[in-house]
């Protein structure tokens, strides 16, 4: 999940990058001798680098809830991983860092994996983000057939509306723009490139 904020030149840009299963030394700027991360290294050199931090949880949903709200996951009711069949998510009444930055005039965007609820009321655009482009949960999950599909949805790898509705295939994590599914399954080969364009 990436968070991007921008305002006047006198106000700093804010970019928060959260990666699943990343170790402390998996980036060049934190000492990795093997993994090359020149763009992130440059951002760390030109910006602020945090060296003492703790994850709010060991799995996706609660760690993301903690990062965005500044609260323990148990306090905001997100104790375990959410699945496509779940009808819950991060409570829209929780105040997120995106809400706080937006109140200060920042433009906000969430790009990448969300995993805090896929129903409209839980998506990033209901949590302080102006826009969202990404996958609503883990790459190995499927699609919730109750979600709205874009009129111009791109169906790939032999996927049809019929087998989506009948849950014939797994690993159909969709790509979303704001509150609509725009591609199913998300093209994992081009996803990173599209996130950064």
State what each model feature region is.
Residues 1-197:
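Formylglycine-dependent sulfatase
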């Amino acid at each position: 999940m990436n968070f991007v904020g921008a305002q006047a030149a006198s106000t700093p840009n804010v970019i928060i990058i959260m990666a699943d299963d990343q170790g402390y030394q998996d980036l060049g700027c934190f000492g990795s001798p093997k993994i090359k991360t020149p763009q992130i290294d440059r951002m760390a050199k030109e910006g602020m680098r945090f060296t003492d931090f703790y994850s709010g949880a060991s799995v996706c949903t609660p760690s993301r809830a903690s990062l965005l709200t500044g609260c323990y996951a148990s306090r905001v009711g997100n104790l375990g991983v959410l699945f496509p069949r779940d009808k819950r998510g991060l409570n829209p009444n929780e105040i997120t860092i995106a809400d706080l930055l937006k109140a200060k005039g920042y433009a906000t965007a969430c790009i990448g994996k969300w995993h805090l609820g896929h129903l409209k009321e839980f998506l990033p655009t209901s949590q302080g983000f102006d826009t969202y482009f990404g996958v609503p949960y883990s790459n190995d999950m499927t699609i919730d057939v109750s979600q709205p599909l874009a009129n111009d949805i791109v169906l790939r790898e032999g996927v049809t509306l019929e087998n989506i509705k009948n849950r014939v295939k797994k690993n159909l994590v969709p790509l979303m723009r704001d509150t609509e599914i725009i591609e199913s399954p998300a093209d994992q080969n081009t996803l990173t490139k599209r996130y950064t364009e």
